[in-house]
Amino acid sequence: MTRTIHRLWKRKNSAYFGKGLVFNKYTGARGKSGSNDANAEYVARLRNIMDTADVSFQTAELGKVDEGGGGTIAYILANYDMNVIDSGVPVLNMHAPWEIISKVDLYEAFRGYIAFLKEA
């Protein structure tokens, strides 16, 4: 899951409804503390898989240093020398009693995960 537009973050780094699966290349907080950064070759491979399967996708950031953001376990998996990137759908009101997502994004995520499992 990735938050949609937040008032403290730049819009160009935000996820949008209706634009598909979201990839978060870099995750972490306070600089390099508990962080993960997918390498360019792995990101290129994922992009190729999504393009070949005609899956709509976008990139976004989980937050902004010292202004809050999302948490992830990607760094734990990366500690085992795995190539890791976070992916999900844009969510409005994340972790609130009523969360909102787009059906289009959910369907593209489903298609993207199927394509990844077939090709990776």
Describe every region a protein language model picked out.
Residues M1:
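Acidic, glycine-rich loop-and-beta core segments that form the ion-binding/anion-interacting portion
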Residues T4-W98:
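Active-site-adjacent substrate-binding region
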Residues V89-A120:
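His/Asp/Glu-rich mid-to-C-terminal helical/loop segments that flank catalytic regions of hydrolases
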